[in-house]
């Protein structure tokens, strides 16, 4: 079956081709009711706009795509906000994605492909994600980047690999890391090897599947050790950044005023843990003598901070490399059964938990 075209969308939605084009190129210029009708027709048909006005099924581009979430719209950001963001360099997703990008670039070059990268600002076929999908032969998407219904549309026309998080669409190839196993081993290390009993966990939003999996691993370790098992993280961060690490650490210390502090704080990622180190130093709390601190991810900065950060290292570059391999395999054999990979993680012992 041939790929649906702009003509099909126009006919189904009862508008002109020019109107369909405006919906994708300048959506604010089209009345909301008309825009919704066009987008609904596009979803129903499985239409993905091609940036080069070419049918996705007709030829290859020699390009693979990666899309990861972006939590700030650069078009709405003021100059002052942009300058502050650049100075802080505090985006956990950017640091995490950078390692995945490096892995994808290396593997793509081996196969003679270029890599096109996009930060998703919004869902829907009119979004940047769909525009990128029209320019690539295959697409890797980080969890929570594209709404499931929109991803279903895109995946009808080109191979898609989901990275991180649980498998949400059964027919798509999928790669994740052993988040729960890694956090469980980290908590066991603090309990068994350092004799720590009063632990606190700072997680992310419930919508973050990786952060939730890490919390479950923490719960399992506490249960095994006969420690109290919390139903919820001690605190949740709205965004897993250094700033949120500082804020949540201050909140935990304030909450413990007049009673025993936690002996260790486990953070759902490295960026928050690094923010915690800043907060604890500011408040005169010694790490690890007074409170141990741990993270998760193994970003390069975790080696540089003082004290160096104990963390769970996930193979971020390998995640990118495996994504390319799955896309290449899917392009060669579109009908093969979907693949789901679980990549192992490793515990990195450093000074922030008391290891030499």
Name these PLM-found stretches.
Residues 1, 63-188:
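Alpha-helical recognition/docking segments in bacterial nutrient-uptake
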Residues 1-63, 356:
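N-terminal helix-turn-helix DNA-binding module of bacterial transcription factors
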Residues 16, 62, 137, 196-199, ...:
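Short acidic/polar active-site loop segments enriched in Thr and Asp
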Residues 24-27, 71, 122, 146, ...:
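Short, glycine/serine-rich, charged loops/turns that create anion-binding
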Residues 27, 59, 74, 125, ...:
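Generic structural signal for helix capping and beta-alpha/helix-loop junctions
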Residues 44, 103-113, 155-162, 167-356:
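Bacterial carbohydrate/catabolite-sensing allosteric modules
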